Amino acid sequence: MASTVPFSPAKVQMFQATNCHGHAGFGSSFAVPRTGPRPRSVAVRVSSEQEAAATVRAPSGRSIEECEADAVAGRFPAPSCVCQTPKAPDGTPEIRPLDMAKRPRRNRRSPALRAAFQETSISPANLVLPLFIHEGEEDAPIGAMPGCFRLGWQHGLLAEVYKARDVGVNSFVLFPKVPDALKSPTGVEAYNDNGLVPRTIRLLKDKFPDIIVYTDVALDPYSSDGHDGIVRKDGVILNDETVYQLCKQAVSQARAGADVVSPSNMMDGRVGAIRSALDAEGFNDVSIMSYTAKYASSFYGPFREALDSNPRFGDKKTYQMNPANYREALLETAADEAEGADILLVKPGLPYLDIIRLSRDNSALPIAAYQVSGEYSMIKAGGALNMIDEEKVMMESLMCLRRAGADVILTYFARQPPAVLCGMGTAK
């Protein structure tokens, strides 16, 4: 008889994964390059003797046909072993099993089953890495945030982005540490086209054209008063005048190449005004991630140290939300969605899981959560004191944010979950 088998003289190049994309299922694909002509079919004559020698036999030496005949006749081999239930410890009461049709533990009894039925997952696509930047060349550690630095806006910044991309993280949000000499009551440095943030955006987009760059739209890093808006002589934060400045800031960032502008200041009407300003300048494709439910939280302390942006007087309770309020988030969600927001963000994250779920249930827009500096520092401190397992608590906290309904998470841990999922341990 004649059999047709493929024959190819081509040499196939070896390939291997260079990072966790290759072995963690993060959406990577590999093309196997070939050289030489296309494979062709060659007829090979097989003799009857060769065909008989190729008859497949079971490990016992008997052919498949013989085994099938035994099965039809009801002759089955004896099992090699009989599985027995392990013995319970002495003193365990002997009882009749409970009469239950449903036992949820059945679906949790092995790692394979638990993985098969897991409802929530985390991937690098769900993570956004915040980056603190400053004008200096050297990276400066942030005391209240172990492992975080104010990055030199060129070398240190690029190194951090390279590390994140190595584990599949391609989204970044920028927060500038602005010199005091550039701060003013009206925050005019916020829309300087040659300022720190626009220069950083251009640098990143030149080196990594495919990354997603989020920017913060707020005056507090640029304000000599440390507030998110212009402060009147009597201490009142001016809303509409601040929104005017924010529009110029957002346009400046979009002009530099920002993909997503993120108004975090909680001024009324800011989203609609920024959307109109962007569209008027031709930036119809630039998205807006609104800090929809940003609470006046005590969890922001380390962040404000990182940027030296603490209010010089008072607090931010006249514009940020009361932590005691739940229904108010519905008002903010409806307003921002109507004004043209593309993404709705809840901040802080873990203490406000109910607000994340509320937003998820009441909007079809993507929901973001910010695991803020205080949440990060608590986990780091607990791990350093060996009071908790830092890696496990970090993963659980992020999984909880995803389970509550967050599509994306802004977190200072962003480089670590992909490394953990790859089996490489916490990224350094």
Swiss-Prot record:
CDD domains: ALAD_PBGS_aspartate_rich
Entry's localization field: Plastid, Chloroplast
Residues holding Mg(2+): E332
Keywords annotated in UniProt: Allosteric enzyme, Chlorophyll biosynthesis, Chloroplast, Heme biosynthesis, Lyase, Magnesium, Metal-binding, Plastid, Porphyrin biosynthesis, Transit peptide
Location of the active site: K294 (schiff-base intermediate with substrate), K347 (schiff-base intermediate with substrate)
List of residues binding 5-aminolevulinate 1: R304, K316
Pathway: Porphyrin-containing compound metabolism; protoporphyrin-IX biosynthesis; coproporphyrinogen-III from 5-aminolevulinate: step 1/4
Reactions the enzyme catalyzes: 2 5-aminolevulinate = porphobilinogen + 2 H2O + H(+)
Cofactors demanded by this protein: Mg(2+)
GO MF entries: porphobilinogen synthase activity; zinc ion binding
Enzyme Commission numbers on file: 4.2.1.24
Pfam families associated with the record: ALAD (PF00490)
Coiled coil: none
GO process annotations (BP): chlorophyll biosynthetic process; protoporphyrinogen IX biosynthetic process
Binding residues for 5-aminolevulinate 2: S373, Y412
Catalytic class of the enzyme: lyase
One GO CC term, this protein: cytosol
Function (record text): Catalyzes an early step in the biosynthesis of tetrapyrroles. Binds two molecules of 5-aminolevulinate per subunit, each at a distinct site, and catalyzes their condensation to form porphobilinogen.
UniProt similarity note: Belongs to the ALAD family.
Listed name of the protein: Delta-aminolevulinic acid dehydratase, chloroplastic
Organism for this UniProt entry: Hordeum vulgare (Barley)
